[in-house]
Amino acid sequence: MSTPANAKHIAWKNVEREKLNPLIDREMVVGAKIMLARVLLKKGAHVPLHHHHNEQVPYILEGALKFAIEGKEIVVRGGEVLCIPSMMPHEAWALEDTVDLDVFDPPREDWLNKTDNYLRHER
């Protein structure tokens, strides 16, 4: 059972922003079993094809991302959610400036230890 001593109360303005490349920034809040990441993508940003053991749920707050999954293109716009199962290869393009709130279960170890080189490319 969780106690108040275990709870985290965080203002987004206090979350460190990391610049991954000229078109993508990221902010993360991590719990014991889940990760919440706000990803800010400028129009034209590309998240290369990748997969991971984590289940991913991107919730687009503003803008639009075009995902390529299983040979299909899916456009997810502000106010929409996409559920991406574990180990499913996917990539995405920002069709406009976009704010994406990603939920991962479990937390992305490659993001935490900064071995996510597929995102740290220069364009």
Q: Residue spans of the language-model regions?
A:
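Short acidic-glycine-tyrosine-enriched beta hairpin
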Residues: 71-86
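Short, conserved beta-strand element in jelly-roll/cupin
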Residues: 41-42, 52-67
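A short, N-terminal "cap"/entry segment at the start of jelly-roll beta-barrel domains
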Residues: 1-33, 37, 116-123
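Ligand-binding loop in jelly-roll beta-barrel domains
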Residues: 86-110
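Short strand-coil-strand connectors
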Residues: 32, 68-72, 95
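Short histidine-centered beta-strand/loop micro-motifs
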Residues: 27-28, 39-40, 47-52, 93
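A cytosolic small-molecule/anion-sensing beta-strand core signal
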Residues: 61-62, 77-78, 96
